[in-house]
Amino acid sequence: MDISLDESCVALESSVKLLGKTLERLAEQGEHSRRLTSTLLRSKRVFELVSEYDLQRARLDVIEEVEPVVEKLCSKLEKSLNKLERERATLQQTYELNQLRLNNRLAGSGGRRPVVMGTSTTEELGRLREAKQRKAALEREIAEVRGT
């Protein structure tokens, strides 16, 4: 343990000597280049007053950069919302249809069952009326065939 401590001390002393030599060399090199030490290595903060016109121009430039991006994001958001609304309407109709099927299954197959309509267009309602009329006509024909 004493040996490793001695070796550590020797290594530390050599590092300190090497660092001292490096500092001396830097000082010598720095003397040749006063510009480097006086200007480049010194940090200065410069505060300047900016005119109101320049400030407004900078704001307008930022707005001109950001506005197209915001508009694009808004249009994407609107498209996504429309898509989700259509999907919600489809799911609502599917839910109503499945609810109707479940109610019909639970009620059994007795007589006429009431038709529950969700959101329908006039075209769909017209087709439904035509289908009911065809059904009634076919039932009459079946009754006539059985009667004869």
Curated annotation (Swiss-Prot):
Principal subcellular localisation of the protein: nucleus
Listed transmembrane segments: none
Keyword entries, A-Z: Cell cycle, Cell division, Centromere, Chromosome, Chromosome partition, Coiled coil, Cytoplasm, Cytoskeleton, Kinetochore, Microtubule, Mitosis, Nucleus
Superkingdom, taxonomy of origin: Eukaryota
Record-linked PANTHER family: DASH COMPLEX SUBUNIT SPC19
Function: Component of the DASH complex that connects microtubules with kinetochores and couples microtubule depolymerisation to chromosome movement; it is involved in retrieving kinetochores to the spindle poles before their re-orientation on the spindle in early mitosis and allows microtubule depolymerization to pull chromosomes apart and resist detachment during anaphase.
Protein's recorded name: DASH complex subunit SPC19
